[in-house]
Amino acid sequence: GHATDLYCQAYFVYDSKKSGGLTQSHLRFGHSPIRSPYLVSAADFVACHTPSYVHKYDMAKNLKEGGTFLLNCGWDLDGLEKNLPASMKRTLARKHAKFYTIDAISIARKLGLGSRTNTILQAAFFTLTGVIPIDQAVTEMKDAIYKTYYKKKGQEVVDMNNASIDHGINELVEVQIPDAWLNAQGTPVENHNPAFIQDVVEVMNRQEGDVLPVSTMVKYGLEDGTWPAGTTKFEKRGAAVEVPVWNAAKCIQCNQCALVCPHAAIRPILLDESEETKKPAGFETVPAKGLKQYTYRMQVSPYDCTGCGSCVNVCLAKDCALEMKPLDSQLKEAPNWTFAVEEVEIKKDAVSAKNVKASQFAKPYFEFSGACAGCGETPYIKLVTQLFGDRMYITNASGCSSAYGGSTPSSPYCTDKKGFGPAWAMSLFEDNAEYAYGYLLGQEAVKRQLAAHVEALAEAGVAPDVCRAYLENANNAETSREASDALLDALENNGSEDAEFIRQNKEFLTKKSVWAFGGDGWAYDIGYGGLDHVLASGKDINVLVLDTEVYSNTGGQSSKSTAAAAIAKFAAGGKETKKKDLGLMAMSYGYVYVAQVAMGADPAQTLK
């Protein structure tokens, strides 16, 4: 702003993904004050920084006649012909657009900048828009880079970023739009997703949710605020620049990569003989170690991976069994993923909570969330759902975990093929523990009523052995599911009021695992009073505190969990007092079990 006399205005629109989501920047520049309290609908310049967006959004819709369109991609003209939707080709041609491409992803990788393409694309922006003279823009950008990085990172990092500016200017490619694009015709793509996903979720993910009528919400029973589980598996964002590729010959089958994956996008798969005969071409498997009846494969979902590289970093194989490769080269793995999760059954005899490897053969009931690439919180949530997910009640405090855990229309908590999975809800920041307590007390009240009806049936001689077996196992986490199923089977043809009540409330038959999730801002500070009350109750309730030692979701303010002298982004002066010992305070009751865990330090202790 200081480099020009122009007035400027900026509006930003974004989704609730913590990273890898959509951000729209609406910029205006002019010689007089700008008084336009609305978004840009006729733009001189439109840039698309993520190639996959051309298939998700109408990227050229708001481009002016004769405007400039910049696409960050690695496609030449043949690649553009193959990959651009017909509708976008027609729009660019009919608006006589000036069309440019730049492969910022490859440039960043070549310069050692990883996936950071922002400086490259900023240089391209100044080159194409002429908001300020390009020489002045380069000088200003390089001065800013020096001030930002020289003292903290050194001259090498400064040089890398300076080079990215030069490449952003020099490697722009102007595309001559073929005349044939005026009447481009595409091949219709069949959408096999459920009606709810097509009618509601996909519309909202296209940022068009404001056009949905109330009648659509009523049609799908959403008027009470409930939302179907497991919608994230239909998003297939393709947000990664690179994704891991599994080398079967080097793999030691430790499953550590699956444990640390923040998005459940890499999973160990076990196949029996029947499934082996049905596997698609290219679905390489090897004999499973310690499980001779099965074959083994580590499967990656390229469209759901965010490319963080945590799996590569944790690999215990001598020569590393995972290698990061460009996303485009691995899209062929998508059908393999579909086969692995849809056609291959979870092998219950291989699942165990006794060791890390066996725990990862369990289904994660938390997948493909909007958490940041490499998130350190979500692996813990995912692991908890692998252990207890089919019978969990979860309440969530405000914070990162609520943003990636349940921001409409994305629901990462999912169900298995039988329809079992976590029930998730969020109330206020300050009453999350009390909310979980209410969950517990409410389902206990219903269970007492159920027990009375089951007892009445037993006394009436209706399947007395089955009824008493249920009563004996109703609060046993390991056996209540089996006892509940047996009870429902025995009462299938019974028309009594007792049996009808049981059928209507069958979801409460099994022993529930009630959890309160939240960060240190909730547990140490804002919600501590309620948390203390619930812990003191002595009730069978669980709490997962995702302790990042700062208020993460709001940018990085210090909390009572922040260590003494620690500097946070918005607390640069350093913490003057020491970290609150929440675990010790809870243990002082004498009947509260506390486990302090760090997956990176000791995965086995974390699991225990």
Language model features with spans:
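Alpha-helix capping and helix-loop boundary segments enriched in small/acidic/polar residues
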Residues: 34-37, 41, 108-112, 132, ...
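Ferredoxin-type iron-sulfur electron-transfer modules and their immediate structural context
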Residues: 137, 141, 153-305, 312-393, ...
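Short internal beta-strands
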Residues: 68-74, 397, 543-547
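Short acidic, glycine/serine/threonine-rich loops at helix termini
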Residues: 20-23, 58-59, 80-84, 111-113, ...
